[in-house]
């Protein structure tokens, strides 16, 4: 009979703990990771710019659908393999060195930009991805911190390296 009070109490404390942890995390964050590739910036930029092909090499994106342009900017709905749906809009496009896109969770409290910067180095290039994000929901902030704010960037850099048959060494 005591367990009927202990188990719900423990669950309530865990939920309260996540809420408090999320509330003390900053809503905004900036994260940058980079990777050296043995590819020309033009080759890497072309792959990143071709969003229709994203599901063929990304371990997280299942489907990409084009949406009507937003203020003259290309927009897509990207369905992740785990079910989340993001709206991505191209904000800046400077081939072959810079690509900036915004991402927002459809109907949700997550918003941010990803900036791809490609710098020639030797026979290849260094690609740096910077995420400037904002999560208003404290539970999202808590889970993002526990998961690692750089996890999505590292996954995309790993996918890029594998697409080109290279071993990822992310910095």
Regions found by a protein language model. Name each.
Residues 2-70:
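Hydrophobic ligand-binding cavity/cleft-lining segments
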Residues 3-10, 14, 23-26, 56, ...:
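Hydrophobic-ligand binding "helix-grip"
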Residues 71-75:
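Short coil-to-beta transition motif at edge beta-strands of beta-rich domains
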Residues 103-162, 166, 170-171:
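Beta-strand/loop substructures that line and gate deep hydrophobic ligand-binding cavities in soluble
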């Amino acid at each position: 009979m005591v367990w009927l009070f202990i188990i719900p109490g423990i669950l309530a404390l865990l939920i309260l703990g996540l809420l408090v942890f999320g509330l003390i995390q900053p809503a905004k964050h900036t994260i940058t990771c980079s990777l050296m590739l043995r590819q020309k910036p033009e080759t890497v930029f072309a792959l990143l710019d071709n969003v229709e092909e994203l599901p063929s090499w990304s371990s997280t994106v299942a489907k990409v659908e084009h949406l009507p342009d937003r203020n003259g900017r290309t927009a897509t709905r990207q369905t992740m393999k785990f079910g989340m749906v993001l709206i991505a809009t191209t904000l800046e496009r400077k081939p072959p060195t810079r690509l900036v896109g915004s991402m927002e969770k459809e109907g949700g409290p997550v918003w941010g930009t990803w900036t791809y910067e490609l710098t020639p180095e030797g026979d290849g290039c260094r690609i740096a991805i910077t995420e400037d994000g904002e999560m208003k929901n404290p539970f999202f902030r808590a889970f993002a911190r526990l998961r690692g704010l750089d996890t999505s960037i590292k996954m995309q850099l790993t996918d890029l390296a594998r697409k080109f048959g290279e071993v990822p060494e992310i910095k």
